[in-house]
Structures are given as C-alpha cells and as structure tokens.
C-alpha cells in the first residue's frame, strides 16, 4: 500500500539561483497536461514553439493526463497481474498499459508481490486486490507510516534522513524540476489530486488503528518546520513520487543510470552515488519516451536501498536555501484551508466508498473530479495565475527610475575627421535609442494602462495581456542598455569604444527571450486588435483618439512594429561605425563581434516572424476558403505556406489570341499549388480591414506542376547563345515539337514567328530550285538565295527576342487534370502574368526549389541535432539536385583530388529562369592514379550537368585554380587590341593545374573550346606544387619544400616561366594559399605566414595550434574571420584576420558521431564558407553544415549543424561554390546573337545595313515589305518587293507588340512597358534565391541504409550537386 504523497516546493528564486539547486537541469518543465488546441502556453525555456499560435484563450480547461481514468482492463483470475513478468526496453515500454489487472471478487490473503510487477493504478484502486503485507518486519519498516518522499528502493531514490524507508510494489521516477509559468496553475491540482489517491491506496480496509497511527506519524512529521517550509512558497519545484494513472513508464526500468559504475554497477550507494549531471537531460517527458523505447544505457533495474551523496547534499542545500529565502505568499492560508477541507471530505468519501457498493464508487469518482475542478478553477486560476504572471515579470529588473539619460558631451577641439564622424554616428545611436524607448513607453502608458483601467473594459484582461505581451520586458532590456550606454557616452572622449556595450547588452539570453516571445506573439496580437476593431466601435474610437493626440500621429500598429525593426536599425548604425573605424582601433574587434551578435539575433527574429506570418496566413486561408476538404487539408500541421502572389490569369483561344483576363491569387504551399479568386466583404468603416473570401478555382499537387518556358527544350541551353543557321535549333521550334507543351505566347507575335518559319522553309525550297536553273542570272543565283536565308534568320532571332521580352512577366503552367475515359492522365494549361519580371523569376525559382524538396532523396537529406532552437530550419537545408559520375571511360582507378569552377558570363533573361539560374559555367575536376592525372570538364550550361570533355595529364594533379579574365582599362575611343584571344592568354579565362612532377599547366577555359593548353613550365627544382593562388598580376604556387614561388605576367598576358620571387617559409609543405585583400596567407606546418603582395615580405605570423604535429590542411575566410582545419583531428579553429586572436573551436566529430554508429576517427578534408553555412567535407565521406553569420562580422558558428545522409564512399576531396558572373560581357552578348558560321562573311556584311533598314521601316507603315537582299538599293526596288511576313521589322520594339488589340489589355493591366533595354536593367535587379554547391569524392551512398559492398563502378569519381535556399537575400 502507498503512504500519502508529499509535495515539496522550492522557494521563489531567480533564474541564477534556481540553477544552484536544480541539478543543472536544462529542461525544467514537469509533465504538463495535454493542452487543448487553443490553450494558453508559456515557455520559460524559450523553446521554439509554432509562432503565432501561442495565445489563443478560447478553450476551456482539460483534465490533466495524470487525472484521466485508466482504460478498463480485462478480468483475469487470481493475482496474475502481480506475477506478470516485467516488460523489457525492447517492448517500448508498453507493458504498463497492456498487462491485465485482476479485479478482486472477495478478500483473500494476498500473495507476496514482486517489487518489479506492473500494476495499473486506477484512481481508487478498485480494480486491484489489496496490496499484500509480505512480513511483519517489512510492516514495521513503514508500510503504514507516512513519509515525505515515496522511495522505490530498487531504484535507489533519495529518502529524507528523518523518514523511514519503504518497499513499494510499484513506483515511478522521482521528478525534480522547476515549475514554469503555466505549471503554477496545475500545482495545487496535483496536490489535491494525489492526496486522495494515496489515502485510497494506503488505508487497509480491515483496520482503523493503522489510520490513526498514520495520522499521528503525519502530525509528528508535520511538526518539524523544515518539513513544512515548502508550504510557504507554493510556486516552485515539485519533488513527487506518486505514480500517475495510465503511466507509460516501466516500473522495472528506471531512467537513471549508474554513472560511476557503468553497466556493471548496480549499486547506488554512498560511494557510488549519482552525479548532479545525471539530472541534466531528464524531464517528466521521459515517461512518454519510455513508450517509444529508451536507450538501454539509460535504463537500470538492479538497485539497492542506499542513498546518494549528491542527493543528500542537494537536500541539505535545498532546505538551507528555503530557510534563508522563504517569504510569505499571498493566498497561502486560503490554499491550506481549502486543502484541509478537501482532504477531510476525501477521507470520508474514500471510507464510504470502501464500505459501499459499486454505485458508491462511481459517486466518489465524480466527487473527486468535482473537487479537482473546484481546486483548479477557484483557488488557482482566479488567484495564483495572476500572481504567477507578476512573479515571472518580476524576474526582469525594474529600472524605470534608475537609468540616467545618455547625453553626449560637447565636442572637444583637435579631433580627426574619423573621430568627428564616429561622434556623429554615436549621436545617432543615442537619439535612435531614446526614440525607441519613448515608443515602448507610449505603448504602455498611452494604450495598455488606459485600456486596463477603462470601465467597462473593451479588452478583457486576457486579450490585454496577449496584445501587449512582453513589451514591458523589452523596455526593461533597453533600459538596462541605456544605463550602459549613458555610462559609455559620458566617457566617450577618453574611451571611444561602443562595440563592447552592444555585445554585453544584447548577448544576454533575456534579450532573446523577450524579443522571441514578442515576435512569436505578434501575429496573434495583431489579429486580436483587428478583430476587436471590427466588433467593438469603442475600441476603434479609442485608437483613433490616441493616434490623433500623439504629436506624430503614429498608429498603435506602427509602434508595435518597432521592436521587430530594431535590430536591423542597430546593424546599419554599427556598420556605419565600423566603416569609420580604422584597423588597429581598440573598438574594431568589439564592433565586429557586436555585428555578429546582432545579425544572429535579427536573423532568428526574422525567421520566426516569417514563420509566424506564414502559419497565420495558412489559418486565414483555411478559414476563408470555400472548400471544406481544402480547409482540412490546409489545417495539417506539416503543411506551410511558401508564398502567395496576386497574378493576372490570361485565357487564350486556339489561335493564340487573348480571350479574357482575370485577377487571381496563387498560393504555393510546400506540397500544393492553389488558384483562387479573391472576393472581399466591404466594410462600412474604411479603417477596418475588410474580410476576404476565396473562391477556389483549382488545387493540384505541387510535384505535378511544370512551368513551360519559351525555348525550354532539352539541349537548347547550349545553343541559346550561339544559335545555328538551321531553324530546328531555334527556340521557337519547341512550340511545334511538343504538342502537349504548346507555348501560348502573345497572339500576333507568335503568329508572326510562325509565318517567318514558314517562309524560311519556302526559301529553302526556292534555294534548291535555283540550283536547278540552267541559265546564269545576275539577280537570281545561289548567293542571292543565301542572302534571303540570312535575312530571314535574323528576323527570326529578333522576333524571338520580342517574344521573350513580352514573356518577362508570363508564367505558363502545365497542370494535371482528371483522367480521360481510358484512364490516361490529362493536362491543362494556365497562363499567368506577374506584375514585375523579378516576381516571375522569384516565383519560378521557388517552384523549382519546392519541387526539389519533395523528391525522395531530400525527404531524409540531413540529420539535425536541435540546440535550443539554434538548429537550421528544414526550409533552409541544402537540397540534393543530383549526383553523377564524372568519367567518360570506365577507369575506376582514378580518384578525385581537386576541382576549380569557371563561371561564365551569360545573357541573363528573366523569361528563362531555370534550376541553375545562379550557375552558368564549367567545373574542372582533377582525378589521379598513382602515376598520372585526368581532367574532366562538367558543363552547367543547361538544366542537366554533363561531362563535355575528358583528357589525361602527364602527372598526378594536386591542385587547380581558376584565373579570371584580366580587367583592361581602355581609354574611350581607343582602338581594340589587335591581338587575338588565342594569342593573348589574359583575354580568356584560364585554369592553372599544379602537378606532382613540379609543373604548372595553363589551359584555356571558355565555352565550346576543346582542350587548349596555353602554357607549361616547371617550378624551381621541379618541386611538387601543393597549392595555387593568384591576383590579376601575380600567380603564387605553394611548394612541397616549404617555399612560395611568385610568377608575374608577361607583356602578352601569359605568365613568366621563371618565378619573380621565391619566398622560403620553412621545410614543411605549403598546403594552402589564400588571398586576402593585399596579402597572401600561406600555411606551412602549423603556422600561417602573412605575405605582402607588394613587397613579398612576411608581415605577420599566426600559430594556429600549439600542439606538435598539427599541420594545417585547409583555410577558408569569411568576413573578418578565417577558419583553419588540420590534417589530423576533427577540430576547426576560428581566428580574427586583423588581430589574429583565437575566437572559437568547433569539433565536427560531435554531430557526426550523433548520426553514425560507433566512434570512427575522422578529419577535415575540404572546407567552404558560403551564404551563412560553413560546409565541411570529412574523411568519412559525409558533409557537415554549420550555421554562421552572413555579414562582415565574425563568422562564428551560431548553433549545432547538420550532417548529410548523402555521402561519398571516400573522403570529400573538394567543395566549391558554383556562381555566375553578374556583370555582362557586352561583346559576348553581341556575338551570341550573331548568325552561325555559314555564311559568316555575308552575315557580318549584312548585319549593319539590314538593321538600319529595319529601323527606318519601323517608323513607317507596319505592313511595309522587308528587304532581304545584300544591299539596300532604292526605295523603289524595296516597294516593289513583297513578303509574307507582313508587319515584321528588325527593330527592338515591335509594332505588333505595342498596337495589337489582343495584346493591349494585358499590358495595360501590368503597366510594364516592354523593351530589351529595360529588360536588361531589370535583370540586374533580380535577386537569386538559391546557390549551387558541388562536392566530389568516390561514389555515392545513403547513410543508414543496409550496408553492402559497393560495386566497382559505384566507386567512380562522383560529384554531388546541392542547391542552397537563400531565404534572407
């Protein structure tokens, strides 16, 4: 039988003091009741909840999990339940629920109970036989004596020193925790809940004397003040061992492990107690985790009746703290009286139940429930909830009357210009902060305070707290900041430092706590305001009055937006301050650290705000949609909104003419695409936002949506810039080639293009017939026919450009329809127009990324370990585009060694976004055998990367480097350089290859070029080339003998074969070179040498590691930090590039070993920092991605990272970023529009005059004829000619595009004039939404799949292409 449970509470402590006695517990929440759907939630641990959903108070109370009735168990005979074997961990802890419990039919002498038996405890034990009394000795031990802690001896739990030891037949883990905000509302409930259970289970039905002994023992125990001190502070921790009903925990397997003895230690004695760290990661959720299986290392079943030193010391320290810090709490007397009345009533009910019938038991059960509800509603929510909120708010220091105002002293004389500018920026910081604090005070004083005092209340207390949640805490954070700021401002002229004040003030957890909860609640608060404005005119009138009374007429919404905008403002101010802080200034490093802190904080807040808004919008869409099934579909927890856009749907007829247009709203969710018509409900008040309803047009799975782009056929990517003579290579032919993907462009433009293609075909037939002529005619021969063909080809190119220009805002989607009668799939087409070209490009890229995320290979792409919300969200995970071998011949002996990426300038066009919109170049990959090397060139010119060339090299390739085109500064009007690109190496991009034999080879790298080696020369003493780096005028080679060779450019643009300078650094190989502004960083051994580019002298030296034998292998720079990796070990080190200070160490083995079984040794084999990620290739073949800031601050790792499930079968040898050149090469752009090589001379001759003729014709009659000859001739001759192409012209602006009636409607709606020049300008404004990263190694595998021996062909050199979403660009 069970003695009454005891609730022990800790005094009211602040967070720092709680950490002293809470056994270093990271998670201090007791097991909460299952919350209702809209139940109010508070989270003192700052865990990331679903933003925008925290505060919805419309739901009633729900019975806690511990108070629910157990499911009825089937009847069995005898005491079989007590003899049932204990379930093992492998059974997922299900035994506590599935073991049948015997229902007694009569009182019998019970058998001895196994302490590890599984017993289902119902509220009054009506389904259980009386717990047997094993022996008189055990009876004297204390079966009927109440205690402070229920101590299941097999688990080795702690017992108060003044209480006897018990031998219970069942147990549950001791819970040691601190109550959170919402738990305070449940603590008294647990008190009242579990006391009657204890009574009902402990009082024997045959003896009332035992009850008296219990009461007297309880009275003696309660007489000790140390044992009743907990009642003075009912707000703190609970030490409780009362078994919960329907508990999922296994009584025979406890969650605490013997740390000292490991698996062999079964004793929890004074010598082998628990360390306090054992409580670090255990919370009450462990019970639920047992249901899914706890790791065996955390389970223990062989314990003895001993005490732990740690828990004894913990108890003594806890009792001392209680005596020292105990304070009276309002309402304690009432709670005690209520508890005594309830206990007395429960004792009578239990006694009546034991002597009564089954009907009496049911009445008792109902009475207990009513008692619980009474305790919950009367004594708790009405009284303790408000005090609990006030207590939580008091955790923040009230500094309203303590902070001085920051005043900048008068400017002294003799300051430098930089000091003057810094003082002005400091003044901006002070003024900005003062205005911000005033805005926060206005929220509280002009809105919250009057609303709370208003009678009758227009906002309930609950809604008032929701609207102004955490504003006071944010104000207190900034009041503390103002204290530090005022102190620093007063001594500015002597200190001139501000960065450390920002770091100290905004790196505190309380700042992130307050802002995070404010941002998470913002959407809910705004929704409450909108709803109240619409339903209560008095509230709307109050807002109007306050706005009109304010000097700047700022609305409440604008004031509430200021906390969300605050950190971006800080970042801009600190960036200005940093720009005016010279290197070597003591404030420079603190400013960079402050930028890092603020950027990390702002990024988290922005992401949470975005997530909250998206989830809130999904809920609003679900409410406003007219389809019930879609409402349920949108309510799914795993579905989130990517974006919603207003577009104009265009309906065409069979001839390509516009029939009608209609405004639509297109919703892109992570797996569904929906199109709806927006219908607004008008409101009588213009200030009240009218509610919107959506009439659904269609919804389709996102994975089945295809965006059809003009010219998006396979293989056209390579030909789009160098179109061939023959029309089948033209982009326009795609419309006829694929009937199921017919492109529906502007009607007249499309028809003109079809006419041109028809005429080109006719001219081809005429050309053949002319060849059959017997006579020789001056104006009718093969040369004239070629002129006709060339002129038509130019017209086709121009017309395609016009269509692309018209398509800069057009999106054509192929969508799945219903199956036809034969069961075959059908498709329908929808054409939309966006309002700007940038929206279209962004939308198509979002579609491509969302579809990529739905692919099977990305369902389990990365393993993440959550770290208090600092993990990378799934929406930002790199997505695997694909993997491919990079060998032409099947020669598996080649192994990947290095790579270099050559970005290509390309004619950007918004109408042609593809999956590789940020990569249009070539990846050169070097592979090696033991004696020779091989180079494979992979093209990223179209949507599918492919190997375009592969050739061998005489020696093993150890390093590669891309050398861009040398920037030439020509005077305006100067003649072009007469040298050809084939002769001058600096006019074309090149790839430098360093080999083991000590040679450097220079290869030409440009589109369409085959293997062209421009140079080949040897290093001094033919020393092996380990690394390469370059500037525009110098090439540097790190050699195996510890030297760096510097080569200068020759007058013809090539590299001198003899080094300009050889810089000797040491005897160890120079494994890594890195250019940083005007210095070269060279790693030799464990040191980094900083070499001046101008003087070739060593300016500085960095010792990266003090241990002997640590050799630097890789370096990566970002902002003002440099990450350094070593050939052995798994540690990365971060150093400041200006002061060379050691800032951070990261061990990548930690996340890798969390995913991979065992503890395999690993090292870093490649390194890359890009777009907020530090990507690390490992010797085990897996990638590790760690989050880092993106601005010019310090790139420290800001959270635990991710480990890729996609891996190579060998070390990851390289990680490169595939970028695109954003600046266009105008010469190449012009060349790309030139006709093909045949007949090249005639085309070059005719290009200029033909363009002039077209331009002149475009100003006249749109039906004027086109001249296709090789000379202009006279206007009379041209007027006598005719053309079937009608209104065609060579001008960039087509008359059909501007004046045709069927096209005018859509362009009037879009208000977007179309021209090639404006198109080119818009292309520069468009922002990329993703980036490509390529890694290489041997083969490809999925981690955690069934291990099998890979085939030989699976070990071929392979690259994996990743696409990284850029959410914050």
UniProtKB/Swiss-Prot annotation:
Residues 46-64 have a biased composition (Acidic residues). The keyword Iron-sulfur does not apply. Residues 304-355 form a coiled coil. InterPro entries: ARHGEF10/ARHGEF17, DBL_dom_sf, DH_dom, WD40/YVTN_repeat-like_dom_sf, WD40_repeat_dom_sf. Residues 421-608 form the DH domain. The modification Phosphoserine is found at residues 180, 379, 1287. Residues 1-106, 184-254, 1226-1260, 1277-1297 are annotated as: Disordered. The modification N5-methylglutamine is found at residue 1338. Residues 83-100, 1279-1296 have a biased composition (Low complexity). Keywords: Coiled coil, Disease variant, Guanine-nucleotide releasing factor, Methylation, Phosphoprotein. Methylated at Gln-1338 by N6AMT1. One of its GO terms (biological process) is positive regulation of stress fiber assembly. One of its GO terms (molecular function) is kinesin binding. One of its GO terms (cellular component) is cytosol. It holds the Pfam family WD40_2. Changing residue 1338 to R: Abolishes methylation by N6AMT1. It is linked to Slowed nerve conduction velocity: Affected individuals present a reduction in nerve conduction velocities without any clinical signs of peripheral or central nervous system dysfunction. SNCV inheritance is autosomal dominant. This is Rho guanine nucleotide exchange factor 10. It comes from Homo sapiens. The gene is ARHGEF10.
């Amino acid at each position: 039988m069970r003695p009454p449970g005891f609730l022990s509470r800790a005094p009211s402590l602040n967070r720092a003091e709680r950490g002293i006695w809470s056994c270093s517990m990271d998670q201090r929440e007791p097991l909460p009741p299952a919350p209702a759907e809209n139940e109010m939630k508070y989270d003192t641990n700052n865990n990331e909840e679903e933003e925008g959903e925290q505060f919805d108070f419309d739901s009633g109370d729900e019975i806690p999990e511990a108070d629910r009735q157990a499911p009825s168990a089937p009847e069995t005979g005898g005491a079989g339940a007590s003899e049932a074997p204990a379930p093992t961990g492998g059974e997922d802890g299900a035994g506590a629920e599935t073991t049948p419990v015997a229902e007694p039919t009569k009182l019998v002498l019970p058998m001895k109970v196994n302490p590890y038996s599984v017993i289902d405890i119902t509220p009054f034990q009506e389904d259980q036989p009386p717990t047997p009394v094993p022996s008189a000795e055990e009876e004297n031990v204390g079966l009927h004596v109440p205690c402070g802690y229920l101590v299941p001896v097999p688990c080795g739990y702690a017992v108060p020193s003044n209480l006897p030891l018990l031998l219970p037949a069942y147990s549950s883990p001791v819970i040691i925790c601190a109550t959170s905000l919402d738990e305070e509302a449940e603590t008294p409930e647990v008190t009242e809940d579990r006391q009657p259970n204890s009574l009902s289970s402990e009082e024997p039905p045959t003896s009332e004397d035992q009850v008296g002994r219990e009461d007297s023992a309880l009275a003696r125990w309660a007489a000790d003040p140390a044992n009743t001190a907990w009642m003075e502070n009912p707000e703190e921790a609970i030490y409780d061992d009362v078994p919960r009903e329907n508990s999922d925990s296994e009584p025979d397997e406890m969650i605490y492990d013997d740390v000292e003895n490991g698996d062999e230690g079964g004793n929890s004695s004074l010598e082998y107690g628990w360390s306090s760290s054992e409580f670090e990661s255990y919370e009450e959720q462990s019970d639920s985790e047992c249901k899914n299986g706890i790791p065996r290392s955390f389970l223990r079943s062989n314990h003895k009746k001993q005490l732990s030193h740690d828990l004894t010391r913990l108890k003594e320290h806890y009792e001392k703290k209680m005596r020292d810090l105990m304070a009276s709490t309002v309402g304690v007397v009432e709670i005690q009286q209520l508890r005594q009345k309830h206990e007395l009533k429960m004792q009578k009910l239990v006694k009546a139940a034991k002597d009564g019938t089954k009907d009496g038991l049911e009445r008792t059960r109902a009475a207990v429930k009513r008692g619980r509800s009474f305790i919950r509603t009367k004594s708790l929510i009405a009284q303790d909830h408000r005090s609990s909120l006030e207590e939580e708010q008091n955790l923040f220091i009230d500094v309203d009357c303590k902070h001085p105002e920051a005043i900048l002293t008068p400017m002294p004389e003799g300051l430098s210009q930089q000091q003057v500018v810094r003082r002005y920026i400091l003044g901006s910081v002070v003024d900005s902060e003062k205005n911000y604090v005033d805005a926060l005070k206005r929220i509280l004083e002009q809105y919250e305070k009057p609303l709370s005092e208003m009678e009758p209340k227009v906002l309930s207390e609950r809604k008032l707290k929701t609207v102004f949640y955490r504003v006071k805490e944010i104000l207190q954070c900034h009041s503390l900041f103002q204290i530090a700021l005022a102190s620093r401002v007063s001594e500015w002229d002597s200190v001139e430092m501000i960065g450390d004040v920002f770091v100290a003030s905004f790196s505190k957890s309380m700042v992130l706590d307050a802002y995070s909860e404010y941002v998470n609640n913002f959407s809910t608060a705004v929704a409450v305001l909108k709803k109240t404005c619409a339903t209560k005119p008095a509230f709307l009138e109050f807002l109007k009055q306050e706005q009109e009374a304010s000097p700047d007429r700022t609305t409440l919404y604008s004031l509430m937006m200021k906390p969300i905008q605050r950190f971006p403002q800080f970042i801009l101010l600190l960036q200005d301050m940093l720009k005016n802080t010279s290197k070597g200034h003591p404030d420079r490093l603190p400013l960079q650290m402050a930028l890092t802190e603020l950027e990390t904080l702002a990024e988290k807040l922005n992401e949470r705000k975005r997530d909250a808004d998206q989830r809130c919008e999904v809920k609003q869409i679900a409410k406003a949609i007219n389809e019930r099934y879609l409402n349920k579909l949108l309510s799914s927890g795993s579905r989130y909104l990517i974006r919603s856009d207003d577009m104009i749907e265009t309906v065409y007829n069979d001839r390509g003419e516009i029939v009608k247009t209609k405004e639509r709203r297109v919703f892109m969710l992570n797996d569904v695409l929906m199109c709806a018509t927006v219908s607004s409900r008008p409101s009588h008040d213009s200030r009240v936002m009218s509610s919107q309803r959506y009439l659904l047009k269609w919804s389709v799975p996102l994975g089945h949506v295809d965006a059809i782009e003009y010219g998006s056929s396979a293989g056209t990517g390579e030909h789009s810039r160098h179109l061939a003579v023959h029309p089948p290579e033209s982009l326009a032919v795609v419309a006829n080639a694929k009937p199921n993907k017919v492109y529906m462009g502007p009607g007249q433009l499309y028809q003109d293009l079809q006419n041109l293609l028809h005429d080109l075909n006719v001219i081809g037939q005429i050309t053949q017939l002319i060849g059959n002529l017997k006579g020789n005619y001056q104006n009718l021969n093969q040369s004239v026919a070629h002129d006709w063909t060339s002129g038509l080809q130019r017209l086709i190119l121009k017309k395609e450009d016009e269509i692309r220009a018209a398509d800069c805002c057009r999106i054509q989607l192929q969508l799945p329809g219903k199956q036809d009668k034969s069961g075959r799939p059908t498709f329908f087409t929808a054409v939309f127009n966006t309002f700007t070209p940038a929206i279209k490009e962004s939308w198509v890229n979002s579609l491509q990324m969302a579809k990529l995320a739905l692919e099977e290979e990305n369902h389990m792409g990365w393993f993440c370990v959550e770290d208090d919300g600092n993990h990378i969200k799934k929406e930002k995970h790199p997505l695997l585009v694909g993997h491919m071998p990079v060998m032409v011949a099947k020669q598996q002996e080649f192994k990947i060694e290095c790579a270099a990426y050559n970005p290509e300038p390309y004619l950007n066009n918004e109408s042609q976004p593809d999956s590789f919109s940020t990569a249009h170049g070539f990846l050169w990959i070097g592979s090696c055998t033991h004696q020779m090397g091989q180079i494979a060139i992979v093209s990223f010119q179209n949507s599918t990367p492919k190997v375009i060339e592969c050739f061998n090299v005489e020696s093993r390739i150890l390093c590669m480097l891309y050398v861009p085109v040398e920037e030439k500064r020509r005077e305006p009007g100067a003649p072009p350089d007469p040298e050809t690109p084939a002769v001058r190496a600096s006019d074309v991009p090149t790839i430098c290859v360093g080999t083991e034999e000590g040679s450097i080879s220079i290869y030409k790298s440009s589109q369409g070029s085959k293997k062209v080696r421009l140079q080949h020369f040897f290093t001094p003493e033919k020393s092996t080339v380990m690394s390469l780096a370059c500037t525009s005028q110098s090439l540097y080679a790190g050699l195996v003998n510890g030297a760096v060779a510097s080569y200068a450019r020759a007058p013809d643009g090539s590299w001198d074969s003899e080094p300009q300078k050889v810089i000797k650094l040491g005897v160890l190989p120079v494994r890594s070179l890195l250019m940083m502004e005007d210095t070269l960083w060279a790693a030799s051994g464990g040191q980094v040498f900083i070499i001046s580019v101008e003087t070739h002298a060593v300016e500085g030296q960095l010792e990266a590691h003090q241990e002997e034998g640590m050799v630097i292998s890789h370096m990566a720079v970002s902002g003002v930090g440099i990450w350094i990796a070593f050939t052995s070990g798994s540690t990365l080190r971060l150093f400041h590039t200006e002061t060379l200070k050691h800032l951070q160490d990261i061990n990548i083995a930690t996340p890798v070993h969390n995913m991979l079984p065992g503890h395999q040794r690993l090292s870093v084999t490649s390194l890359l920092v890009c777009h907020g990620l530090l990507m690390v290739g490992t010797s085990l073949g897996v990638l590790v991605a760690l989050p880092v800031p993106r601005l010019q601050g310090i790139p420290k790792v800001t959270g635990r990272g991710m480990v890729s499930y996609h891996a190579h079968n060998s070390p990851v040898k390289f990680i490169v970023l595939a970028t695109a050149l954003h600046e266009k090469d105008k010469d190449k752009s012009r060349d790309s529009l030139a006709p093909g090589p045949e007949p090249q001379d005639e085309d070059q001759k005719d290009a200029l005059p033909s363009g002039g003729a077209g331009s002149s014709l475009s100003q006249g009659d749109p039906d004027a004829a086109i001249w296709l000859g090789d000379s202009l001739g006279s206007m009379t001759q041209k007027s006598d000619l005719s053309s079937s192409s009608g209104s065609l012209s060579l001008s960039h602006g087509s008359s059909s595009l501007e004046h045709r009636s069927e096209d005018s409607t859509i362009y009037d709606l879009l208000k977007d004039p179309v021209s090639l020049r404006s198109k080119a300008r818009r292309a520069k404004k468009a922002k990329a939404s993703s980036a490509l990263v390529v890694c290489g190694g041997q083969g490809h595998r999925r981690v955690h799949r069934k291990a099998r021996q890979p085939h030989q062909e699976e070990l071929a050199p392979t690259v994996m292409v990743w696409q990284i979403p850029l959410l914050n660009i």
